[in-house]
């Protein structure tokens, strides 16, 4: 790639006009795009990864958020790294996705780059959850919820709940309880080929919700089952070093101590 043409959604023309940029409807932009640039934090990357999934375009995150763990370009690096992007001097980091569907008549489904979370509503009592791996009961939790995370998501909510950090190239799924009412309820790591089912137990005057990457919540009821497995799609993140994840851990997580 020796030269670049910048495309932007036409609805941004008034608020973000830049001379030389082509403003087109979104459905025309994406098929012509080589790389999607996001400007924001991790939430922006997660949103765009799901929103543009069908186009399978690499994403480069430019961080102006608080952490920007998934972004590999800081504002003060833009000139250098965008020039490298135009020259084709970058790498593509393939990240696995989770596919989730709620079993039942409506069959709600979604994808997650970071995590699938089943949790109780605010100020509600603890809820019982049963975890099945390939239809075999492996754990029963009573607590505030359960996080099912990818290696990408292992440094996000799952980590804050006590889960392990996985190398982004590890082929695994992390299941982490949220505030379990037990001294012996550790996070568990499963092979990516496994099918994970989360079954909601008895619910008394409680609200239970499922969300993918922190997006809109889907309500669950007693007896509901969410089936989670490896998606047949991936997300490609633009990176400039194979060590970017470990550099981010050192610079953006340890630096907070």
Where are these regions (language model features)?
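Residues in the short beta-alpha loop(s) of Rossmann-like NAD(P)-binding domains
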Residues: 10-12, 179, 232
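Catalytic core of DAGKc-family lipid kinases
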Residues: 67-144
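Gly/Ser/Thr-rich active-site loops/lids in small-molecule metabolic enzymes
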Residues: 140-143, 148-184
């Amino acid at each position: 790639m020796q030269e670049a043409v910048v495309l932007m959604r036409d609805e941004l023309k008034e608020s973000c006009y830049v001379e030389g940029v082509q403003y087109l409807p979104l459905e025309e932009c994406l098929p012509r795009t080589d790389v999607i640039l996001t400007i924001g934090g991790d939430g922006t990357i997660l949103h765009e990864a799901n929103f543009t999934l069908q186009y399978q375009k690499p994403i480069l995150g430019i961080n102006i958020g608080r952490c920007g763990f998934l972004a590999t370009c800081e504002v003060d690096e833009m000139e250098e790294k965008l020039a490298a992007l135009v020259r084709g001097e970058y790498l593509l980091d393939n990240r696995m996705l989770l596919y989730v569907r709620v079993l039942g008549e409506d069959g709600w489904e979604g994808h997650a780059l970071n995590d699938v979370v089943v949790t109780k509503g605010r100020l509600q009592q603890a809820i019982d959850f049963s975890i099945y791996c390939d239809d075999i009961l492996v754990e029963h939790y009573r607590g505030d919820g359960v996080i099912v995370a990818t290696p990408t998501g292992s440094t996000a909510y799952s980590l804050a709940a006590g889960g392990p950090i996985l190398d982004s190239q590890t082929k695994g799924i992390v299941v982490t309880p949220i505030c379990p009412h037990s001294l012996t309820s550790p996070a568990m790591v499963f092979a990516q080929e496994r099918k994970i089912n989360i079954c909601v137990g008895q619910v008394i005057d409680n609200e239970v919700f499922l969300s993918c990457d922190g997006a809109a919540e889907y309500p669950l009821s007693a007896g509901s089952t969410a089936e989670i497995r490896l998606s047949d799609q991936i997300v490609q993140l633009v990176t400039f070093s194979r060590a970017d994840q470990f550099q981010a851990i050192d610079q953006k997580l340890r630096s907070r101590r």
